[in-house]
Structure formats: structure tokens, C-alpha cells
Amino acid sequence: MVYMRGHRLDYDGWAEEFNLPEWRFNNCLPYFIAGEQYQGDASEWRGKTGRLGVKQADYPDPLYDAFLAAGEQSGQGRSQDLNGANPEGLARLDCTVANGKRCSAATAHLKPALSRPNLTLIHSADTQQILLNGNKAQGVVFTHRGERITINAGREVILCGGAINSPKLLMLSGIGPENHLKDCNIKPRIHLPGVGQNLQDHAKIRLQFESKKRLPFHSINNPFNKLKAGINWMLTGGGMAASNIWEAGGLIRSNSDVTHPNLQYHFGPLGFTISNGKIKVEQAFSLNVDQMRPKSTGEIKLNPSDPYKSPMINFRYMNDPYDLNEMVEAVYMARDLVSQQAFDEFRGAEMKPGDQFKSEEEIKDMLRANIETAYHPSCTCRMGYDDDAVTDSEFRVHGIEGLRVVDASVMPRIVSANLNAPIQMMASRAADFILGRPQLDPVNLEYST
């Protein structure tokens, strides 16, 4: 639900490093603006007429206030709008919410189109292969309720399987690294060595602290409180049941050498433990720290014993020493933030990872054992024009006519933000490319770095 666009230098970096001049930030910004229906104050940075409901989170909780105040006390800063001219510091996060409900891409774009006569939605289907006639994509094969079905494409096949399933499907269709396909007994059709490579994600570490005060979120599992929150939501569309919990966060720099924020906070006014598959809410608060631009990259490969099974995924988190050192800095930054006076009335003992991890080497050992995914896989069918690129600047797969990939896999490098907003922007641009419409005019606004 978090709506964060990414930094200007992310997109300008795509343009400069991967020969993608049309992907500069000023070319992307008009699509961000056009796509959103922002529920806050009018701004040249924000859109009011789009389909995607966006609002700044506003559930009142004193721990959110403490978090923001600690940002100013620590020198980590404060931003009024992380999607505006100053995307650095701590802030209340933007979320894709409309009328107290999550506003997803399906809510905003798919559901309103389901009645169209030229659209058929088939769910719970498993796509098996892209059909090729020479070097032209002509359809797909999928299974649905035990039946194997072939669909021919009128113009193009557009693959939107995500950073894991898109490269898998390309490889099942003979498009990918030739030697790996042969190892899986798949006839190579097009040798694209970059398919499944360059896998990137935001690595994450969670810090959790006991709260000396018991606050409303800490009692949310109480049946009476659940009922109360549900009734309040049904009557008003607001309250605790309309919150996504992670309503505050920030973008910060761990050191002065980085060009733009390299760490992201997500702050929640509760803690939790998981036992036997059940979540127990704790009287605590949580601070997630995500690494925005890791140097480590992984890969997606088919399972040679059965390529149609789930692929083999190796993120290789912390494989590059730079990433491990940066995440050590992240732990120190997060602890410094929580040590500020604003948290004094709330801060109890550090529950996770625990204050027994003090030295750099102790923290490195802890990170190796406890690093988590932020669930932002990307970059496995990346755009570009070098030998390892899979798609071009208009999402077309190199060497194949009538085949595009439109999802997070085409990012040349992961952006410094949650992927929700960037992917919706990219999909909007893809629609114009596919239909042959001109791209929206660039928007040039003053931007603080």
C-alpha cells in the first residue's frame, strides 16, 4: 500500500548508465502525476484526476509523532512529502487508499474495465509457454482447471508475470541462456543470457523495542477491540481498521558519500512475534530498515529436474561486502534514531535483534542470520541495449517480434522506493508505447538532492 515514486537520480541513472534517455525522471514524472488521485493539498507535484487513490497516512498515534520528532532531533531530517521536491528525511507515508479501502492496481484499473467486450479475465490459470512462429510470438499455452488451452494473439503477447515468473516463462519458451536451457532439456530458440540474471531486491532488517506505554494498536487482537474497530470502519471508513500499520517512514543517507538516500525506514506502532504460524501482537514498536540500492545481485533459474516447478531463486543478499557494511550503518542509524529524547517515554528494551549485538562484527553475524526480503524482486529481464539486456526501452523482448514484458523485471536497476508506484507508472507508459500513442510531455520541476 505504500506509494513512493523513487528518487530522480534513480531514473536519470537508468538513462545515463543503460542508454535509456527516454527514462529520465522528467519523462516519468508526468505519468506519476496523471495516474494518481491525490487526496491532499494541491501541488504541482501531485495529480488529482487519475484513477489511483493516494493519501498521506493520518491515523493518530503518539508513536508516529515520536518517530517524526526523533528524525529532527537526530539530524536525520523531516520531509513534508517524500514524493515531492524534497524526498529525504522522515515523514508520514503516502498509501494507495480510497474511501478507507486499499486501492490496488486491480481496483483502480482492472475492475472498471471488466465489463468491456474485448477483455476476458481468466484467473487461477498457469501459463506454460509462449508460442513462437520463428522469431514471432503468436500466442500462449496455459492450463486451467486441468485443461490445456492455446490462445492465439491478434497483435502482441504481453508478459506481466513479475520478476520471478516472467523470466521463468521466457526460459520455458526457449528464450534465455542457451546452456542453461539445454541443461533443462529445453530447445533454445533465442539466446538471451540476461534472462533471469541481475535479480535485485531491497534487503531488510527489523528492529523491535518494548513500549513502556500500552497504546491502542497493542490491544488490536482483543475481540472487543476488533469489533469496535470494524464497526468504526463500517460507519466512517476510517480508524484503526483503515490503517496499514506502517504509516510513517523515511529516506535517509547512511553516510555523506552516497549521492541520494540509500536507506528506507518503515515504522509501525506495534511489535509482533510468530509462533506455530500464528502472529502475536506485542506491546512494542517496530522499525524496519531497507537497503535501497544493493550491489549484490542474484538469479532466477529453472529447476532442471522439472522446469515447470517453482524456479530456483538465489538473491545472494549481502554477497557484496559493501552491502554488509551499509547494513551495519543502517543498524547504527536506526538505534540512534530510537535513542532520541522523543522516544524516552515509550522506549523499553530492544527485543530484536537485541542489544547483545554491539560491535561491527557482532552486527555482521546477526545480519547474515537475520536479513529479510522486502518483497521487491526486480530487474531479471532488464531494459537496455548491451549483451545482457533482455528488453528495449519500449518493453519489447530483443530478437522476438510481438512480445513485450511489462513488470518489475524490466527495471535496469532497482529504485530507491517501494515498487508499487514505479511499476504502475511504467505500465502506463507501456500502454502508450503499445498503442502507438505519443508519450506525455516531460515535466521539469525543481528537485532537491
Short names for language-model regions:
Residues 97, 122-133, 263-274, 281-288, ...:
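A glycine-rich dinucleotide-binding beta-alpha-beta segment and adjacent secondary-structure elements
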